[in-house]
Amino acid sequence: MFELKTLFLFLATALAEIVGCYLPYLWLKRDGSAWLLVPAAASLALFAWLLTLHPTDAGRTYAAYGGVYVSVAVLWLWAVDGVRPTAWDMAGSLLALTGMAIIMFGPRHA
């Protein structure tokens, strides 16, 4: 159950960060409304708050979170940008998730 909760929390954190960064991108690069900055700021605040909910030390959380972020960003590429990931994108995502699993769920010895 710990693993499932941790993975869900990482996914929610990644989505909050990606949305918080994507909305200003739409404003700056795709002529979106400046009002996009309001939900972007809320999403980034949610991202920061979600980081505080992770059940391990901050450095370990940030390191492991990076692997989930990479994978969610590749899925975003496909779902939102409409660009199908390459085999290399998928292999890199799998490698990043493997690193996350080792960091988060590997044995802890003092």
Swiss-Prot record:
Keywords: Cell inner membrane, Cell membrane, Membrane, Transmembrane, Transmembrane helix
Bilayer-spanning residue ranges: 7-27, 33-53, 63-83, 87-107
Membrane topology, record value: Multi-pass membrane protein
Domain of life according to the entry: Bacteria
Family annotation (InterPro entries): UPF0060
Keyword flag Ribonucleoprotein: no
Pfam families: UPF0060 (PF02694)
Subcellular location: Cell inner membrane
Gene Ontology annotations for the cellular component aspect, listed alphabetically: plasma membrane
HAMAP family tied to this protein: UPF0060
Family: Belongs to the UPF0060 family.
PANTHER family: UPF0060 MEMBRANE PROTEIN YNFA
Name the record gives this protein: UPF0060 membrane protein Nmul_A0351
Organism: Nitrosospira multiformis (strain ATCC 25196 / NCIMB 11849 / C 71)
Taxonomic path: Bacteria, Pseudomonadati, Pseudomonadota, Betaproteobacteria, Nitrosomonadales
